[in-house]
């Protein structure tokens, strides 16, 4: 969802078809120039600006502040991903549970490298800064991030991790901070068998105090879930 002074918009993208957005009344195919819109495989709203992940590319693209169409500007992450691969997903990390100056833009490669940026305008060097690049376990799926309070959870081949803790430990010790540590053998087995299937996703269900990890056992046919109580763990 992307909220602007003109209203709230729901964006739909899939990396194959032209994007659509919905304003509560009408579906519209926005005109986006500077890139091939059908290559947009995921979208986030970060600091009042839409950011797009481009399919099988190390580039992202972004629109002007509060824009829902118009000229897109590309942003290259390739030089930061020393292990190669492509940009797998983007996320916005609020860190304080709200929207503020300390929000980070998070970019992760399919090979397991995370780049963090802080700032407002990526076109202005004075207000845009690379915080760092971190090695992490390889992510599973394009929907590998979910907001969890002031943190982000990341689904990887080695488990589900709070990003704040994952970036604070050496990768050799990372499994001990996974929220899936208690079920690590089962999770590892599912990851080994089904990580290539579409549909991996973590869902937070606050009313039921549950966190659910969806595992597509048979793509588009059958899924199983890991469920955690968010209070008792």
Where do the protein language model's features map onto the residues?
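Beta-rich catalytic cores
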Residues: 6, 37-39, 46, 86, ...
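Beta-strand initiation motifs
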Residues: 25-29, 68-75, 122-130, 169-171
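Surface loop/turn motifs at the tips and blade-to-blade linkers of beta-strand repeat domains
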Residues: 31-36, 80-83, 133-137
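Asp-box/WD-like beta-propeller blade repeats and closely related beta-sheet repeat scaffolds
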Residues: 23-47
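Extended assembly-interface regions of large multimeric machines
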Residues: 1-24
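Structural signal for beta-propeller blades
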Residues: 18-20, 59-61, 114, 160
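Beta-sheet-dominated scaffold domains
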Residues: 4, 10, 92-233
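Solenoidal tandem-repeat scaffolds enriched in leucines and small polar residues
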Residues: 43-100, 110
């Amino acid at each position: 969802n992307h909220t602007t002074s003109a209203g709230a918009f729901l964006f739909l993208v899939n990396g194959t078809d032209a994007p659509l957005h919905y304003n509560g009344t009408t579906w519209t195919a926005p005109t986006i120039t500077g890139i091939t819109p059908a290559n947009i495989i995921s979208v986030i709203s970060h600091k009042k600006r839409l950011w797009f992940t481009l399919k099988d590319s190390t580039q992202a693209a972004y629109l002007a502040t509060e824009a829902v169409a118009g000229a897109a500007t590309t942003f290259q992450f390739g030089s930061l991903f020393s292990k190669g691969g492509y940009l797998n997903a983007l996320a916005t990390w609020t860190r304080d549970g709200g929207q503020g100056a300390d929000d980070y833009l998070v970019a992760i490669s399919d090979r397991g490298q995370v780049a963090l940026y802080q700032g407002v305008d990526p076109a202005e060097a004075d207000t845009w800064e690379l915080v760092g690049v971190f090695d992490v376990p390889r992510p599973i799926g394009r929907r590998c991030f979910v907001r969890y309070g002031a943190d982000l959870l990341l689904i990887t081949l080695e488990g589900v991790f709070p990003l704040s803790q994952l970036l604070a430990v050496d990768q050799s010790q990372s499994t001990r901070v996974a929220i899936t540590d208690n079920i690590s053998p089962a999770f590892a087995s599912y990851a080994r068998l089904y990580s290539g299937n579409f549909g991996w996703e973590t869902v937070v269900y606050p009313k039921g105090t549950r966190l659910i990890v969806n595992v597509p056992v048979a793509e588009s046919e059958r899924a199983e879930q890991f469920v955690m109580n968010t209070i008792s763990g």
